[in-house]
Every structure is written in structure tokens, then in C-alpha cells.
Amino acid sequence: MTLRLSRRAYAEMYGPTTGDRIRLADTELLIEVERDHTLYGEEVKFGGGKVIRDGMGQSQLPAADVADTVITNAVILDHWGIVKADIAIKHGRIAAIGKAGNPDIQPGVTIAIGAATEIIAGEGLIVTAGGIDTHIHFISPQQIDEALASGVTTMIGGGTGPATGTNATTCTPGPWHMERMLQAADGWPINLGFLGKGNASRPQPLVEQIEAGAIGLKLHEDWGTTPAAIDNCLTVADDTDTQVAIHTDTLNEAGFVEATVAAFKGRTIHTYHTEGAGGGHAPDILKVCGEANVLPSSTNPTRPYTINTLDEHLDMLMVCHHLDPSIAEDLAFAESRIRRETIAAEDILHDLGALSMLSSDSQAMGRVGEVIIRTWQTAHKMKVQRGALTGDGARNDNFRAKRYVAKYTINPALTHGIAHEVGSIEPGKWADLVLWEPAFFGVKPAMIIKGGMIAVAQMGDPNASIPTPQPVHYREMFATRGGALARTSLTFVSQLALDAGISARYGLAKRLVPVRGCRTVTKRDMIHNAWQPAIRVDPETYDVVADGALLTCEPAAVLPMAQRYFLF
């Protein structure tokens, strides 16, 4: 005997299925479920009178043969697709994406549930991979709380605290500081990787930082990003399979953008601040988007272009780069970096996939908890102003959604050599997952899972009789306590450091994972974000032309995912 359910009734019970559409928060973005891995009539759901009970949806198999945790009936949004499925987690990793249940009595089961299995109800929820922020100034450890609660589960950057150097540059300089920061990483329930200072004209000062545990090196103009420093840094990176991130020369003191590109010599590099106002060669740093060896990212303070963007930036810049507004030269330096035309073009270059990544620039002009919000605000603004992307139709924005989610998940992972562990929802990867109610998508996660265990969740009064009474806010869960912390989060290091035995030497508790493949990744590998246009920026008007087309758009006066979500 079968019962035919209406689409509405089915969605309310088991979540959306193939062909159903979901609005992302209060944006104009709609995603459509492309495939449903669960079988109609054989869905599993936990609760009183539901399916996951002994002898029904729960099998008699031992712990070794069943999932540790199953997220049931979730909608997965990732660079590779938008699907409905059950997600299995085993030993802290994603074990399978498919159909959960009892293989003894149910057809099509690819994920076995047993007495050893915990259930997280994913009905009606969207699941994304944990975000990766690759532009972190480690100024204050409290940034980690903000980032984690926003859905970011991996942070890459540099610094030592609120030192003047760290306030301006993302560098953890030298072996002593590197050791201290790696020891500090043991205390935080998030994946971390640190960049050493790359500004040196001889190899030894750089190699010793890689040996100490740096996953890469950061070249910053405030330390002198000369062609000699660039060439030396990239040579060391090639020898150690680590990445180089660069903040180029705003003042064009050591050469123009062409001189910097020439110093790259075709070698892979992650260009920070490939944007309209964040820094780097003024006014034409955007030109590097067209280089095959350049992996470009921009930061969130200019995301998206709004009526308030320009006014906000001048004061931020003066503080972050230790400038004095009473000195004419300092003021001119700041004003040269803030250009409405290039900021507007940045929106469009993101939408067309020329800019491959988006990050925060935390407490150094960017907001660490707003990478995900501002990514989707940019996607919304571009849909409203530019319409559907090629590949999307009238029914959904699936391609645009895949393009934008890739900017803070898989592409940063590929760039920094950690995609074998994180960056997407795929079997074998570390189970860093973010669960969202669609109405709060991109703004306020319902739950953040780290290494297969719940790390942060919205939780009500701990003294209440049920979990939901007010005040409901983000609270750290058991994955952040005791020995579980070190077993549910990772610290990324170089292979050179791992071979040198820094784990034992520094007394580290977290698992150390080496980065790999940093030197072979190219712009072509940036998923859904690999466009290499020929860009020209007019030195007088700052107009941006890409492949012959003028890139311009109006600033937004109103944005979604904003004040209505943050009244309290």
C-alpha cells in the first residue's frame, strides 16, 4: 500500500526533493535540487513513531560497519552540485553521500545505520562545507569565535597578536613566533595554518620559517615587496611546495604591475587584494586576473559595492596601515587606494569568475565574521543588476550559487594545498560541515560540525526543560572541550616541518597535516572561477575594461542578509 504525498507535504516531512526550489535567506537567489539520493517511500527519519528504530531503519550491524553519525535528508550545496542526500560521518570524516537505512530490509541503502549511529536531522536544512578564510591577520584570538559562528572552519594567515606589524600584515615572522602560534593553535576548535614573512632577498630567512611550520610565505608592501624579494620568495616556495601570498606595491615604488608580474616568472602565486580598494598596485592591480599563474582573491570590506563603501574605507585605511591623516603624503597614499570605478568592477569580476576567492582581511579593514554573508550579498546584487548567468535559467541560480560557494570553500583549499582534507563535501574529507535553515542561509548557521562532532550550535537556556527556550544564541559544544578539541580540528604545516618532527619538539596536541600541490595549481584549476580576461584600467578615469567590455555597476542602497537579521 502506498500513499501519494503532495510536494508541499513531502517537503514539510522530508525536506525538498528533485525539482523543488529554495530561496537563500532574503535574497533573490533560488537554488533547485538537481537530484535526490534518497528513495521515495524508504526515507529515514528519527523521532517518536518514525523510521530509525531497531529492526526498522536501524540495523543490527556492529559499530565497525555503520556510520558514527548520519545527517538525514539534507540538501547539499557544493561546487559539484545541489543534491538531496543522507550524509555519513565516520571517524571524523565524510564517509558517504547517499541513502541511509537498514540494508537488511531496505533497498538501495549505501549508508548503514546501527546502534552506534547518532542522527542529526537535516530535513529542511542546507549543508555546505566549512568556509576557508585565507586572509587572516591574527590580531586577536577572539576572531576565531566570530569566524566559527559564521560558518568558517579553517583560517589561514599570519600574525602574533595586536603588534603593529600584525595589524597591517598577515605574517608570523621567524621560527620563535611560528612555534608560539602553533602552540596557541592547540587551544582553538578550528583548523589553522600560518604564513611566514616572505620579504627577504636571500633564501635562509625564509626556509627556516617553512622548517618551523609555516604553510607558506606572505609578501607585503609594508615590508618591501620588491622584485628581488618576490623572486627569492617564489624560489623558496618552489623548493618547499608551499604557497606565496602577496600584497603588491600600492605606491609603485619598485615598479609597476608589469614589473611585479615579470618577477613572478610564470610561477604560481596567490594575489591578495586583487580588488578595487584594498591595496596593491594603484590603480591597475586588477590586471593580474588575466594571468594563468595568478590565483586572485579579494577581501570583504568592498563586498559588495554600496553607497557607504567609499566613506568607510578612508578611516579604516589610516588606522590599519599606521598612517597619519595630518601628513599629506600619508593621506595621498590612502586616497590612491580607494577608487569607486575599480570597486564597481570588482563586483562584476567576481560574478564572471575572474576573481576566484573571497576572504576577510580580519581586523585589518575586513570583518572576520562576514566572509560568507558578503559573498552571498555580492551574488544577490549581481543577479539583480545583471540578471541570470550563462548556465542558469528562469527557474534557478544553481550555477551562480556553485560559483560563489566555491570562492570560500574549494578554491582557497586548492590554492593553499589543503583540498585533500577540506573545502568540499566529498567522501574521505574531514567532516567540517555547516547546517543552515534556508531563511537564515549565509547569515546565521544552525550548527557547525568540526571533524564529525558538533562544535557550535544555537542553544537555548541551559537550565530550561528543553533546548529551545530563550535566550537562544551560539554556544560552544563538546567538540570544543578537553581532548576532543585536538581530535576534531587540524593544524596545517609544511611537509618540511612535519619531517623535522615539530609536533614532538613543540609539544603539540593537534594532528598536523602537510600542505601539498601548492606549486602546480593554476588559474585553470579555480573551480567555476577560472576566467582570464585581458584587463585594462584607465590611469586617468580608473575605468575597467575586460576583453573589450566596460565593467561598471551602480552601488547598492539596500542589501539582503542585513539589518532584519541583526535587530538583537
Curated annotation (Swiss-Prot):
Pathway: Nitrogen metabolism; urea degradation; CO(2) and NH(3) from urea (urease route): step 1/1
Source domain of life: Bacteria
GO cellular component: cytoplasm
Any single GO BP term: urea catabolic process
Class in the EC hierarchy, top level: hydrolase
Active site: 321 (proton donor)
GO molecular function: nickel cation binding; urease activity
EC number: 3.5.1.5
Keyword annotations of the record: Cytoplasm, Hydrolase, Metal-binding, Nickel
InterPro entries given in the database record: Amidohydro-rel, Metal-dep_hydrolase_composite, Metal_Hydrolase, Urease_alpha_N_dom, Urease_alpha_subunit, Urease_AS, Urease_asu, Urease_asu_c
CC cofactor: Ni cation
Reactions mediated catalytically: urea + 2 H2O + H(+) = hydrogencarbonate + 2 NH4(+)
Co-factor: note: Binds 2 nickel ions per subunit.
Binding residues annotated for substrate, in chain numbering: 220
Subunit composition and interactions: Heterotrimer of UreA (gamma), UreB (beta) and UreC (alpha) subunits. Three heterotrimers associate to form the active enzyme.
Similarity field: Belongs to the metallo-dependent hydrolases superfamily. Urease alpha subunit family.
Protein name: Urease subunit alpha
Organism for this UniProt entry: Burkholderia pseudomallei (strain K96243)
Gene symbol of the encoding locus: ureC
